Amino acid sequence: MAKKGNRVQVILECTEHKTSGQPGTSRYITTKNKKNTPDRIELKKFNPILKKMTVHKEIK
């Protein structure tokens, strides 16, 4: 029987958007390798509501 893959889907949510007071959220879905990166990831992604690059952290 084949093993399951190490890749899982994770959701990234903007950290700066909560403090801005504007409605809505900026979220991205990506995949990560559990064995190579066991901790939560942080990536700089574009937030279309704030119209700038912001730090997005893994949630859940």
Swiss-Prot record:
Keyword Ribonucleoprotein: yes
Entry protein name: Large ribosomal subunit protein bL33
Domain of life: Bacteria
GO molecular function annotations of the record: structural constituent of ribosome
Cysteine disulfide partners in this protein: none
Keywords attached to this entry: Ribonucleoprotein, Ribosomal protein
Pfam families, sorted: Ribosomal_L33
Upper taxonomic lineage: Bacteria, Pseudomonadati, Bacteroidota, Flavobacteriia, Flavobacteriales
Gene Ontology biological process terms in this record: translation
Family matches, as PANTHER family: 50S RIBOSOMAL PROTEIN L33, CHLOROPLASTIC, LARGE RIBOSOMAL SUBUNIT PROTEIN BL33C
